[in-house]
């Protein structure tokens, strides 16, 4: 497992924390993925389509032998398994998994753009990511973002709490 990737996770339908835990556990259960770091969980106001419930957001670091496109397929599979529907752009969702960084690669295809194109504009992505990624920590502190609507919901307590949760 020679690739390191960072994934943002979000949920704003139903038991949001359970969906986040299940998503992290499903990532970790994949034979080609090991979750190595988890951020705290943040409660955030919706962005884009604002007529919806607040989100819980977090980020994870993984080690993987998957290539970026295989990882994208896995994240979409997990979203579908957890009941994600795509009816409204930026609308409510049970689970949202976005690949933020993959090694230090720049990828720009129709399917996948890495680094994630809007991550530096969104504190709900930067705050959890900066906790677990030194590469982003310095950039996050100087980024111009609206800090209102982003607050720590649950402090991190380690990977084990997430990867051993019931699915």
Curated annotation (Swiss-Prot):
Name the record gives this protein: 2-amino-4-hydroxy-6-hydroxymethyldihydropteridine pyrophosphokinase
EC primary class: transferase
Job description of the protein: Catalyzes the transfer of pyrophosphate from adenosine triphosphate (ATP) to 6-hydroxymethyl-7,8-dihydropterin, an enzymatic step in folate biosynthesis pathway.
Species for this entry: Bacillus subtilis (strain 168)
CDD domains: HPPK
Record EC number: 2.7.6.3
Keywords: ATP-binding, Folate biosynthesis, Kinase, Nucleotide-binding, Transferase
Gene transcribed to yield this protein: folK
Family per record: Belongs to the HPPK family.
Reactions performed catalytically: 6-hydroxymethyl-7,8-dihydropterin + ATP = (7,8-dihydropterin-6-yl)methyl diphosphate + AMP + H(+)
GO biological process, one term: tetrahydrofolate biosynthetic process
UniProt-listed InterPro entries: Hppk, Hppk_sf
């Amino acid at each position: 497992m020679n690739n390191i990737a960072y994934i943002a996770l979000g949920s704003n339908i139903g038991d949001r924390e359970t969906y986040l835990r299940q998503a992290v556990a499903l990532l970790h259960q994949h034979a080609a993925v090991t979750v190595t770091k988890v951020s705290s969980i943040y409660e955030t106001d919706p962005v884009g389509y604002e007529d919806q419930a607040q989100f819980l957001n977090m980020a994870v670091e993984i080690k993987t032998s998957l290539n970026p496109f295989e990882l994208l397929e896995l994240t979409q599979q997990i979203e579908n398994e957890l009941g994600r529907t795509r009816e409204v752009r930026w609308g409510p969702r049970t689970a949202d998994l976005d690949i933020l960084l993959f090694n230090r690669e720049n990828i720009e295809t129709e399917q996948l753009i890495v680094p994630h194109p809007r991550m530096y504009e969104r504190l709900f992505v930067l705050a959890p990511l900066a906790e677990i990624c030194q590469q982003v920590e310095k950039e996050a502190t100087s980024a111009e973002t609206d800090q209102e609507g982003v607050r720590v919901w649950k402090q991190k307590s380690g990977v084990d709490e997430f990867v051993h949760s019931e699915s």
